[in-house]
């Protein structure tokens, strides 16, 4: 009998709760929606926090990579570093440093690209990042096709990301050796470069896509790397009087 009474009491409680839900249906719906929005906002904030905190952790040597900054006499940081800084630091030969590298700010470029069918197609706003040859030692990009060693010895060498290579040439094709003709004059180009460009680059390697959460170009997708760029900032005559990129050091283990 006591069991039946407890069962009946529990049933009455459930009925009253159900009636209350029906009676205050609008308020309950608002409460449920509010709770759902709160959980969603918390989840988004947690994801963004983890995303930002994982910046640069995609790099093999992320714990040993140091971002080098310059400061004014008032201890205010400059925006970036000049392209000559990494060259000067290399000459000092710090025992604690394994390598220095310079990465120019990514900028959009326009190219006429030689396709597999020997045609030339125009591509605009391809985000190119000029780097020096030590970039591979510091950031260890995964080379999928071609050779970084060959690219480092080749003037005006282009290293495409996987997604751009697939977009232009398709899956399973080999774009190594294809030409890309610059279709504009850059601010750092020599005076002899026409306004319509004309400088020829060659594709020497394909690398895995660079993640968006890196110090190199936070939330900006990079389409290609440029090595030994005759039109770029590293060979620009006025490179010592301006900032235009980031300088990094790879510290020795320990």
Model-derived regions, located:
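Single conserved hydrophobic/aromatic residue that forms the stacking wall/gate
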Residues: 1-10, 14
């Amino acid at each position: 009998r006591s069991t039946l009474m407890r069962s009946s009491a529990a049933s009455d409680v459930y009925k009253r709760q159900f009636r209350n839900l029906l009676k205050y249906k609008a308020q309950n719906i608002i409460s449920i929606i509010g709770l759902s929005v709160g959980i969603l906002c918390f989840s988004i904030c947690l994801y963004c926090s983890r995303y930002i905190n994982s910046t640069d952790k995609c790099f093999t040597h992320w714990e040993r990579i140091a971002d080098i900054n310059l400061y004014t006499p008032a201890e205010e940081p400059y925006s970036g570093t000049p392209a000559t800084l990494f060259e000067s630091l290399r000459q000092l030969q710090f025992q604690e440093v394994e390598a220095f590298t310079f990465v120019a700010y990514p900028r959009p470029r326009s190219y006429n690209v030689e396709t597999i069918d020997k045609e030339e197609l125009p591509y605009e706003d391809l985000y190119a990042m000029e780097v020096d040859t030590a970039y591979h030692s510091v950031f260890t990009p995964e080379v999928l096709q071609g050779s970084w060693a060959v690219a480092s010895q080749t003037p005006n060498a282009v290293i495409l990301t996987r997604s751009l290579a697939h977009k232009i040439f398709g899956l399973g094709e080999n774009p190594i050796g294809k030409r890309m003709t610059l279709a504009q004059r850059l601010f750092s180009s020599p005076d002899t470069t026409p306004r319509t460009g004309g400088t020829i680059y060659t594709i020497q390697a394909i690398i895995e896509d660079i993640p968006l959460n890196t110090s190199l170009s936070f939330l900006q997708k990079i389409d290609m790397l440029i090595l030994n760029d005759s039109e770029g900032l590293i060979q620009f005559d006025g490179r010592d009087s301006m900032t235009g990129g980031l300088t990094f050091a790879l510290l020795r283990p320990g």
